[in-house]
Structures are given as C-alpha cells and as structure tokens.
C-alpha cells in the first residue's frame, strides 16, 4: 500500500515541481527525447503510412487500368463509328450518283415524252387542218355544184320547151335502162 501512496505523493510532487509538460522551445528540447518520439512515430506510422500509400497506389493503378480499358473501348467504338461513317458516306455517294442518274433519266424520259406529245399534237393539228381543208373544199364544191345545177336548170328551163324536155327525159331513161342491163 505504501507503493500506491508513494506513487500519489510522487505524482503530486512532480506536478508541483513543474518538470512534466511539453517544451515548445525546439533548441531547449532534448535530442534524445525527439529521436525517441520520431522513432516511435516511424515504427508505428510506417505500417499505417505504407498501407495508406499502398491503397492509394492500388487505387491509382486501378484507375489507370480502368482508364486504359475505357480508352481501348472508346478507340474501338471510334473505329466502328468511322467505319459506319465511311459506309454511310459511300451509300450517300451511291444514292447521290444514282439519284442524279435517275433524275437525268427522268429528265430525258420527260423530254422524250414531251417531244412525242408535240409530234402527236402536230400530227393531230395537220390532220385537223387537212380535214378542215377537205370540208371547205367539199363545201365549195357543193356550192359550185348547186350553183352550176341551178344555173343549168335555169338555162334548161328557159331554153327547153315541152317537146325537147320530153325527149331529154326519154333519152336519160333509155341511158339508165341500158346501164341497168349492163350491170345485171
């Protein structure tokens, strides 16, 4: 029990003496105390610090590996996208060329159809003109014939007497009878 009492007395003695505490004056501190503290820190902190550094190193390496994998995937996707772009560009060029040739073909077909329509219209116009000319000629012939017939009838009526008239009718009937015998 004496030891316990002595320890309390000694704590009281030392605390009242003021020799226990931190000395913040670097030049006044004991180099041995500093080396002991540093040794303890290095001994115990070395494992913690190396674990922290190893963890940090592993995270950095993992991040680098992930970045490399992502970079590889991005490069692969970029190459696929470039290949698709080249394919689409070739298809677009093909469509453009085919489109231009199709447009040119349609233009030529349209021009040919227009020329054919114009030729048909020209033929129709010429036929219509020819028909109208023939109709006009027939109308003129009919009028000339009617006028000639009326003139001839007028001349015959004025020049013919009854006897000449009967003789002409008999001669015409005889001619028609002869024509009928020939055709039968």
Swiss-Prot record:
Bilayer topology: Single-pass membrane protein
Transmembrane parts of this sequence: 27-49
InterPro entries: ATP_synth_b/b'su_bac/chlpt
UniProt entry keywords in alphabetical sequence: ATP synthesis, CF(0), Chloroplast, Hydrogen ion transport, Ion transport, Membrane, Plastid, Thylakoid, Transmembrane, Transmembrane helix, Transport
Coarse class of the protein's main subcellular location: plastid
RNA-binding recorded as keyword: no
Locations listed in the record: Plastid, Chloroplast thylakoid membrane
GO cellular component, one term: chloroplast thylakoid membrane
UniProt GO molecular function: proton-transporting ATP synthase activity, rotational mechanism
PANTHER family associated with the record: ATP SYNTHASE SUBUNIT B, CHLOROPLASTIC
Family: Belongs to the ATPase B chain family.
Function: F(1)F(0) ATP synthase produces ATP from ADP in the presence of a proton or sodium gradient. F-type ATPases consist of two structural domains, F(1) containing the extramembraneous catalytic core and F(0) containing the membrane proton channel, linked together by a central stalk and a peripheral stalk. During catalysis, ATP synthesis in the catalytic domain of F(1) is coupled via a rotary mechanism of the central stalk subunits to proton translocation.
Subunit structure: F-type ATPases have 2 components, F(1) - the catalytic core - and F(0) - the membrane proton channel. F(1) has five subunits: alpha(3), beta(3), gamma(1), delta(1), epsilon(1). F(0) has four main subunits: a(1), b(1), b'(1) and c(10-14). The alpha and beta chains form an alternating ring which encloses part of the gamma chain. F(1) is attached to F(0) by a central stalk formed by the gamma and epsilon chains, while a peripheral stalk is formed by the delta, b and b' chains.
Additional comment: In plastids the F-type ATPase is also known as CF(1)CF(0).
Name assigned to this protein: ATP synthase subunit b, chloroplastic
Source species: Chloranthus spicatus (Chulantree)
Encoding gene per record: atpF
């Amino acid at each position: 029990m004496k030891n316990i009492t002595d320890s309390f007395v000694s704590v009281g003695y030392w605390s009242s003496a003021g020799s226990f505490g931190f000395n913040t004056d670097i030049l006044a501190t004991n180099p041995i105390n500093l080396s002991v503290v540093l040794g303890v820190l290095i001994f115990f902190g070395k494992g913690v610090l190396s674990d922290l550094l190893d963890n940090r190193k592993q995270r950095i390496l993992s991040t680098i590996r992930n970045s490399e994998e992502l970079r590889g995937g991005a490069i692969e996707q970029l190459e696929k996208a470039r290949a698709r772009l080249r394919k689409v560009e070739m298809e677009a060029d093909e469509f453009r060329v085919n489109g231009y040739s199709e447009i040119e073909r349609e233009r030529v077909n349209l021009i040919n159809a227009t020329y054919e329509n114009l030729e048909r219209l020209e033929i129709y116009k010429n036929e219509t003109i020819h028909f109208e000319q023939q109709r006009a000629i027939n109308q003129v012939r009919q009028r000339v014939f009617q006028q000639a017939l009326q003139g001839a009838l007028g001349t015959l009526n004025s020049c013919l007497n009854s006897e000449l008239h009967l003789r002409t009718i008999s001669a015409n009937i005889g001619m028609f009878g002869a024509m009928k015998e020939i055709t039968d």
